Amino acid sequence: MANAPRILALGLLALLCAAAGPAAAQNCGCQPNFCCSKFGYCGTTDAYCGDGCQSGPCRSGGGGGGGGGGGGGGSGGANVANVVTDAFFNGIKNQAGSGCEGKNFYTRSAFLSAVNAYPGFAHGGTEVEGKREIAAFFAHVTHETGHFCYISEINKSNAYCDASNRQWPCAAGQKYYGRGPLQISWNYNYGPAGRDIGFNGLADPNRVAQDAVIAFKTALWFWMNNVHRVMPQGFGATIRAINGALECNGNNPAQMNARVGYYKQYCQQLRVDPGPNLTC
C-alpha cells in the first residue's frame, strides 16, 4: 500500500543523504573523500565513484559499470532479464485487484527498459547475491504499490515541498507526493532524479505517473543511490534504508514483517536462500 508515512520516510532519508554530501572541494563542491559523479552529484557509492566519476576517490570501472543492463551487465551478479521472467513479474501484478490503475501501467518490458540504464543493479557480487537484490527490490515494490496496484500516493493533499531546499526549489502549483514503484517523493528527490534520468522532475513530477519506464527509472535511481550498497548487510538493512524510522526498532513490526514475507517468498521463487539479517 502507498501511504504518507512511508513516503515521508523516503523523503527524510534522501534529505539526510543530501545533507551529508555537498560541502567544499572540486567540481561538485564535495567534501574530501566524496566523489563527484558524472551527473555532478556528491557521494561515496559506485553510482558516484564508478563510471564517469569526475573527481574525488574515483574507482575505475565502478561496481557494475560496464554495458549489459537488463540482460547482463557489470562485474558478476544475476542476469536480470532471465530472472525477472513474465511469470515472475505478472505473478506479482496479477494479485492486484481488477480495478487497480497500475495493472495497465506497470509492465515487465518497462522495467527491463529502465534497468538498462542501471547496469549495477543486481551486479557487483555473486549470482546468488544478484538474485537476492532482485527479490529485495520487488519485495519493497510489492509492499509500496500493493502488488502494482497504485501508481500514485492515495492521499495527494500533501505537496511534499521542502521550501528550505534552494538547490531543488519547488515549482509553483506542483506536488511531490509519492509516485511510481517505490513512491518517490519530495522536491529534493524529484529534482536530481529528473536530472539524472532526463526529465524535469520539479516542473513536471507527474511524468513519473504517466510513463512506466520513467517510473521504474526513478525507483531504480533511488535504489542505486540509497539501497544497493547495503544489500550485503541483509534484507533488514534495506528496510532501514527505505523506511527505518517508522518500521525498524519495533516501531511497526507488522509492516516490517510484511516486507520480509514478500522477500522470502520471492527468494523461494528464485531458488536462493534469503540470507541472514532479515529484520531491523
From Swiss-Prot:
A family per Pfam: Glyco_hydro_19
Molecular function GO terms recorded: chitin binding; chitinase activity; endochitinase activity
Disulphide bond pairs: 28-36, 30-42, 35-49, 53-58, 100-149, 161-170, 248-280
GO biological process entries: amino sugar metabolic process; cell wall macromolecule catabolic process; chitin catabolic process; defense response to fungus; polysaccharide catabolic process
Keyword Glycoprotein among record annotations: yes
Activity regulation as described: Inactivated by l-ethyl-3-(3-dimethylaminopropyl)carbodiimide (EDC) in the absence of exogenous nucleophiles (e.g. GlcNAc4, GlcNAc3 and GlcNAc2). Not inhibited by tetra-N-acetylchitopentaose or modified chitotetraose substrate TMG-chitotriomycin-pMP, containing a free, non-acetylated glucosaminyl residue or a N-trimethylamino glucosamine (TMG) residue at the non-reducing terminus, respectively.
Source species, domain of life: Eukaryota
SUPFAM superfamilies xref list: Lysozyme-like, Plant lectins/antimicrobial peptides
UniProt-listed Enzyme Commission number(s): 3.2.1.14
pH sensitivity of activity: Active between pH 6-3.
Other comments on record: Maize chitinase B seems to be less active than chitinase A.
Family as reported in the entry's similarity comment: Belongs to the glycosyl hydrolase 19 family. Chitinase class IV subfamily.
Record-given protein name: Endochitinase A
Lineage per the UniProt record: Eukaryota, Viridiplantae, Streptophyta, Embryophyta, Tracheophyta
